């Protein structure tokens, strides 16, 4: 347990940010999963793809995902979408 006041604050802030990032990652994974399901079923594919790419871009902007990871995931979703058409 930290003794210095600033170190105590850092622990609190890190715990809060970790919780927030966990929630955002979970929502991102759900959005990607819904996009993949939409591609398989063929219903609302463009809407699901748009939502997934938007979520990936936001996650990359907020440093939840690395920008290259977000780009790779978007590319793979686009490839799957084009293959399904």
From Swiss-Prot:
Swiss-Prot/TrEMBL keywords: Ribonucleoprotein, Ribosomal protein, RNA-binding, rRNA-binding
GO molecular function, one term: structural constituent of ribosome
Record-linked InterPro entries: Ribosomal_bS20, Ribosomal_bS20_sf
Gene3D superfamilies per the UniProt record, alphabetical: Ribosomal protein S20
NCBIfam families, sorted: S20
GO biological process: translation
Protein name: Small ribosomal subunit protein bS20
PANTHER family xrefs: 30S RIBOSOMAL PROTEIN S20, SMALL RIBOSOMAL SUBUNIT PROTEIN BS20C
Any Pfam family hit: Ribosomal_S20p
Entry GO terms, CC: cytosol; small ribosomal subunit
Highest taxon in the source lineage: Bacteria
Organism: Ruminiclostridium cellulolyticum (strain ATCC 35319 / DSM 5812 / JCM 6584 / H10) (Clostridium cellulolyticum)
Entry's family note: Belongs to the bacterial ribosomal protein bS20 family.
Function comment: Binds directly to 16S ribosomal RNA.
